[in-house]
Amino acid sequence: MRPLSVQGAWLSETRAFADDRGEFQELYSARSLRGALGYDPGVAQVNRSVSRRGVLRGVHFAQLPPSQAKYVTCLSGAVLDVVVDIRTGSPTYRAWEAVRLDDPHRSLYVEAGLGHSFMALTDDAVVVYLTSQGYAAGREHGVHPLDPDLGIAWPDGIEPVLSEKDRQAPGIAEMERRGLLPDYEECLAFRRSLCERGTG
C-alpha cells in the first residue's frame, strides 16, 4: 500500500502467482488495508461497471458520516482513475491525483470524504469497486468532472461521455457555497473514530 499525494488515497499493488494451470491473485486483503489505515473499512457492497471509451463517471461522494470509502480495481480494459480532495479546510483542498488502472494487480483506495471519478480509456473497461457502505440515494452527491476550478487533466483526444446527472452536477465552488462538501476536520474526527473501533 502506497499513499498518494491526496491524504486518504492509497495505491495497492498485489502479486499474481502463475503456473501451468493459470494464475491466482488476491485482489483484496483486509489485513493489508488495516495495516495501512489503522482500521478495517469493511465491505458492504460490491459494484461492477462496464464502460465504453470516453465514459466519464463522477466526481462522486457521499455525505459524512458515514460517507462511503471505495476500493477500485479495473479487471479489463483501462481507466484513468482520479481522487479529488473535496474536503473544505484541507491543506490539499481541490487537489487531485490520477492513476491509470489497466492491470488487476493495481487498485486504488479512496477514503470516506474524498471525491472519486474515472474515465474509460478503452471500450469494455470493467471496473469493480468494493464500498464500505451501501448506496443511499439521498446522501449521494457529485461535482462536475470538467469543472475548470478543479482542472482535472483528462486525456486529450477522447470525447467525454457523461450521464445526465453528472452533466448537471454543480462545480466545486457552488457545492461549497451550498455547504454540501465534507469538512476536513470532521473527516479526521470520523477517521479517528474508525481507528478507535478498528472497523468501519
Curated annotation (Swiss-Prot):
CC terms in the record's Gene Ontology section: cytosol
Catalytic activity line of the entry: dTDP-4-dehydro-6-deoxy-alpha-D-glucose = dTDP-4-dehydro-beta-L-rhamnose
Q: Does the keyword Cytoplasm apply?
A: no
A Gene Ontology MF term for this entry? dTDP-4-dehydrorhamnose 3,5-epimerase activity
Q: Active-site positions, per UniProt?
A: H60, Y129
Read off the Pfam families from this record.
Answer: dTDP_sugar_isom
The Gene Ontology biological process annotation of the record reads:
dTDP-rhamnose biosynthetic process; polysaccharide biosynthetic process; streptomycin biosynthetic process
Q: Which UniProt keywords apply?
A: Antibiotic biosynthesis, Carbohydrate metabolism, Isomerase, Streptomycin biosynthesis
The entry assigns this protein to a family as follows: Belongs to the dTDP-4-dehydrorhamnose 3,5-epimerase family.
What's the name of the protein? dTDP-4-dehydrorhamnose 3,5-epimerase
